[in-house]
Amino acid sequence: MKLTCMMIVAVLFLTASIFITADNSRNGIENLPRMRRHEMKKPKASKLNKRGCLPDEYFCGFSMIGALLCCSGWCLGICMT
């Protein structure tokens, strides 16, 4: 009997907590894509997305990976413009 009462109270508590938090999260989920786009415009938010690139006339090697390292995207032993 005590276990049944405890289970009923626990279910009521969890149901009430779902209804309390659901009202607050409704607006947050709708605005989530807008917030992410807004954060990407901030330089501090996108520090991890920035990559260093090699300037022109800098040695980059002779592979396809070297072209990815150059700021211009052209690599023939050195970065080209």
Swiss-Prot record:
Propeptide position ranges: 23-51
Recorded GO MF terms: calcium channel regulator activity; ion channel inhibitor activity; toxin activity
Q: Which keywords fit this entry according to its UniProt record?
A: Calcium channel impairing toxin, Cleavage on pair of basic residues, Disulfide bond, Ion channel impairing toxin, Knottin, Neurotoxin, Presynaptic neurotoxin, Secreted, Signal, Toxin, Voltage-gated calcium channel impairing toxin
Report whether Metal-binding shows up as a keyword of the record.
Answer: no
> In which compartments does the protein localize?
Secreted
> Does this entry carry the keyword Signal?
yes
Q: List the disulfide bonds.
A: C53-C71, C60-C75, C70-C79
Matching entries from InterPro entries are given as: Conotoxin, Conotoxin_omega-typ_CS
> Which tissue types show expression of this protein?
Expressed by the venom duct.
What's the record's remark on domains? The presence of a 'disulfide through disulfide knot' structurally defines this protein as a knottin.
Q: What does this protein do?
A: Omega-conotoxins act at presynaptic membranes, they bind and block voltage-gated calcium channels (Cav).
Q: Which family does it belong to?
A: Belongs to the conotoxin O1 superfamily.
- The name under which this protein is listed is Omega-conotoxin-like 3
Q: What is the lineage of its organism?
A: Eukaryota, Metazoa, Spiralia, Lophotrochozoa, Mollusca
